[in-house]
Regions:
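Alpha-helix capping and helix-loop boundary segments enriched in small/acidic/polar residues
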Residues: 11-14, 122, 126-129, 242
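Active-site loops and adjacent core secondary-structure elements that bind or stabilize anionic groups
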Residues: 152-160, 164-371, 392-410
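Active-site-adjacent beta-strand anchor residues
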Residues: 13, 34-37, 128, 147-150, ...
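Non-catalytic interface/targeting segments
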Residues: 1-30, 39-70, 102, 178, ...
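Feature captures the catalytic cores and cofactor-binding loops of soluble hydro-lyases/lyases
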Residues: 18-23, 27-74, 78-82, 87-98, ...
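A short, charged helix-loop
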Residues: 102-125, 129-168, 221, 226-231, ...
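Short beta-strand segments
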Residues: 13, 80, 103-108, 148-149, ...
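Active-site-proximal helix-loop elements at catalytic-domain edges
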Residues: 1-9, 86-102, 227-240, 373
């Protein structure tokens, strides 16, 4: 094992080719021999960069409609051989196996295919076999091989090539190996969860968390694991804190109960609604929601189920609040609300529907199904002598939606 290694060869097999062109161009400039397969090889050739087909190395064609391309001893021998092991090097010479110093892979998009609602047949075909094997082999042998395991590493890898002219240090290879095992474990977790279908096992996997300003208190570190941008578009304001996110989650889950109703506005503090109203227009809904508890509303999180207009924005602007959430904001409403530089303004793109709630407990975790039931008139059983009026029933159902999301004694 050498600390510094000058790369002379690379194997490239990727699904996402965005950002690949400057990488292969740079490797060619540095004299690195490129091996590749199928569509990736065709893409590299289209950049005017010479590439050797893996089939030429293995003397074996791609078979089973492309299911088996790179799974061959001449490929994995070139990756897994220990450069400092004489027996390994003798075997490579015996079987004419070249060293592979860099392995660059981007896996089939299994997670995205599941999310798209594709058929089971299509999902199964997106379980990457060769790519994941290449990643594990290259990362295992990080002392001699650099593994680039996803498109998210392309920029860092290109910068490394440019900075060190194709040379890699042990610290570089170990860092990329850590990323590779993160990618492989994340990938396998989503495959397991697809097959398990929630039958008792708990396996969670998220990519690198987003560091927050702090946790619940300033002396605590905090991070968010998930795709915030999938749910929100942030227009304005300071970075969200741990407590902000808890309130935002509570606000979104509460408003999901009213997302298809008439204009509704809610104000939350410490994860609980301190005011909520449904009216003919959003401006009046805000006024009445605030009137429920104007004291607790100070520093709260505000959410609407429809576009916030100028009239509503002018009212909100007189209140100190941390976050304002809505499906959309009128342009002049945004201009008004942006007058407070720290106020966080979020477009709600969609209502997330997490199926489970998870929290740490003792030396393990508590897991439960999220409460997805909303009370309806047909579910009610009247047991009193006096029957409720239609208005009373509507009021009770309205209150029930709010009580469902209240974490303290409901009034």
């Amino acid at each position: 094992m050498q600390d510094a290694i000058q790369a002379k060869s690379a194997l490239i097999s990727v699904f996402n080719k965005e950002g690949l062109a400057p990488i292969v161009t740079k490797m060619h400039e540095l004299g690195i021999t490129l091996y590749s397969t199928g569509g990736t090889a065709a893409f590299i050739e289209a950049q005017g960069v010479p590439v050797l087909q893996v089939e030429n190395l293995t003397s074996y064609p791609s078979i089973l409609g492309g299911r088996v391309k790179s799974l061959h001893p001449k490929v994995f021998g070139g990756i897994l051989n220990r450069r400092s092991n004489d027996n390994d090097q003798e075997e490579l010479a015996q079987y004419s196996i070249p060293h592979l110093d860099i392995v660059l892979v981007d896996l089939y998009p299994f997670e995205d295919t599941v999310k798209s609602g594709a058929s089971e047949t299509d999902i199964i075909e997106k379980i990457d076999i060769g790519g994941i094997s290449l990643i594990r082999a290259a990362a295992k042998n990080y002392k001699d091989v650099l593994c680039v395991s996803s498109v998210s590493d392309y920029d860092a890898f290109l910068a490394l090539l440019e900075r060190k002219n194709g040379k890699t240090e042990l610290s570089d290879r170990k860092q990329f190996a850590a990323n590779a095992f993160r990618v492989s474990s994340h990938y396998d977790t989503h495959i397991f969860n697809f097959f398990d279908e929630g039958n008792g096992a708990l396996k969670l996997s998220y990519n690198t968390g987003k560091e927050l300003r702090y946790g619940e208190n300033p002396h605590q570190k905090g991070a968010f694991f998930g795709d915030f941008d999938e749910v929100f578009f942030k227009h304005h304001g300071k970075a969200l804190s741990y407590n902000n996110l808890l309130d935002v989650d509570a606000a979104v889950q509460l408003m999901a109960e009213f997302k298809d109703d008439a204009p509704t506005f809610a104000i939350l503090k410490h994860n609980n609604a301190c005011g909520l109203a449904t009216r003919d227009n959003i401006s009046q809904a805000y006024t009445d929601a605030l009137a429920a508890d104007p004291v607790s509303a100070f520093g709260g999180v505000l959410i609407a189920n429809t576009t916030i207009d100028r009239s509503t924005a002018e009212k909100i602007n007189t209140l100190f609040c941390e976050v304002v959430i809505a499906p959309a904001f009128e342009k002049n409403a945004l201009e008004i609300l942006k007058q407070k530089k720290n106020r966080i303004l979020l477009d709600l793109k969609s209502y997330p529907k997490p199926s489970t709630l998870v929290r740490s407990c003792l030396n393990g975790y508590l897991v439960q199904e999220r409460d997805g039931i909303t009370d309806e008139k047909s579910m009610l059983n009247e047991v009193t002598e006096r029957k409720a009026t239609a208005q009373e029933i509507d009021d009770l159902l309205f209150a029930s939606k709010i009580a469902k999301h209240t974490k303290s004694n409901t009034i």
